[in-house]
């Protein structure tokens, strides 16, 4: 397999991945355009594109309500944005391939671990902020000593593993999907005989990858809402 890398630019001694930045911006732009288009001329009785938008929003709302309860309305928009970003980002790499012998210019943003860990850290940051807002900084920090002070290392480790598992699960599934797609594209140009087989396999794999992309976005908001719910429901569960 040919080795290609994403073009980068250095700023203040930090290398920025131009492909990932561009694809992330494209993902955000697609979300904005779709939501803007679907929400134009909204009616009391939804139909067509408005119906699809409301269905997705209700799907997210119903999913996170299991973990957030009466706090659902406070986080429904955040979870809708997270779901939309992860789902579209997961599937961008399936649309086409754009590369030279040296550089790759098209990929799924979530096939990059930096994007996934950033999303996970964002969720963790919100969890801690909401925990402090709910219990106060003293009460929140005291929670790390529950049920006994001896549990402090385990409670801290749990916070780290939550972030790592959220990022690694997403990265592993999407990155491996792009690797298989790349192998099928190479199989297509290997010989005239493997072309039709690769084409058929690629159609099946693309459909399967889109399904996996949806499942990963769905799991991402389930886990994110679960982590946030644990922080805001802490006192109520005790």
Swiss-Prot record:
Instruction: Please report the record's description of how this protein sits within the membrane.
Output: Multi-pass membrane protein
Q: Can the keyword Membrane be found in this entry's annotation?
A: yes
- PROSITE patterns linked: ATPASE_A
Give GO cellular component annotations, separated by semicolons: plasma membrane; proton-transporting ATP synthase complex
Its biological purpose? Key component of the proton channel; it plays a direct role in the translocation of protons across the membrane.
Localization of this protein: Cell membrane
Q: Which family does it belong to?
A: Belongs to the ATPase A chain family.
GO BP terms, alphabetized: proton motive force-driven plasma membrane ATP synthesis
Q: Which PANTHER family match?
A: ATP SYNTHASE SUBUNIT A, CHLOROPLASTIC (PTHR42823:SF3)
Q: Where are the transmembrane segments?
A: 18-38, 75-95, 112-132, 179-199, 203-223
| Self-association and partners | F-type ATPases have 2 components, CF(1) - the catalytic core - and CF(0) - the membrane proton channel. CF(1) has five subunits: alpha(3), beta(3), gamma(1), delta(1), epsilon(1). CF(0) has three main subunits: a(1), b(2) and c(9-12). The alpha and beta chains form an alternating ring which encloses part of the gamma chain. CF(1) is attached to CF(0) by a central stalk formed by the gamma and epsilon chains, while a peripheral stalk is formed by the delta and b chains.
GO molecular function per UniProt: proton-transporting ATP synthase activity, rotational mechanism
Give UniProt keywords alphabetically: ATP synthesis, Cell membrane, CF(0), Hydrogen ion transport, Ion transport, Membrane, Transmembrane, Transmembrane helix, Transport
Highest taxon of the lineage: Bacteria
Q: Can you name this protein?
A: ATP synthase subunit a
> Is Transmembrane included in the keywords of this UniProt record?
yes
Q: Which organism is this entry from?
A: Streptococcus agalactiae serotype V (strain ATCC BAA-611 / 2603 V/R)
């Amino acid at each position: 397999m040919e080795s290609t890398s994403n073009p980068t630019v250095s700023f203040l001694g930090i290398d920025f991945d131009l492909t990932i930045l561009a694809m992330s911006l494209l993902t955000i732009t697609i979300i904005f355009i779709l939501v803007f288009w679907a929400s134009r001329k909204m009616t009391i009785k939804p139909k067509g594109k408005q119906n699809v938008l409301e269905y997705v929003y209700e799907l997210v709302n119903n999913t996170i309500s299991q973990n957030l309860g009466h706090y659902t309305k406070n986080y429904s928009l955040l979870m809708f944005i997270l779901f939309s970003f992860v789902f579209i980002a997961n599937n961008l790499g399936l649309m086409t391939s754009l590369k030279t012998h040296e550089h790759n210019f098209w990929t799924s943003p979530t096939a990059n671990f930096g994007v996934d860990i950033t999303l996970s850290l964002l969720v963790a940051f919100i969890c801690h902020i909401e925990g402090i807002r709910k219990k106060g900084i003293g009460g929140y920090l005291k929670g790390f000593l529950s049920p006994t002070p001896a549990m402090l290392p385990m409670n801290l480790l749990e916070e780290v593993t939550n972030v790592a598992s959220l990022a690694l699960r997403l990265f592993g599934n999407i990155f491996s999907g792009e690797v298989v797609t790349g192998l099928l594209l190479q199989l297509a140009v290997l010989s005239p005989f493997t072309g039709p087989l690769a084409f058929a396999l690629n159609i099946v794999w693309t459909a399967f990858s889109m399904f996996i992309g949806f499942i990963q976005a769905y799991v991402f908001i389930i886990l994110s809402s679960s982590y946030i719910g644990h922080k805001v429901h802490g006192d109520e569960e005790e």
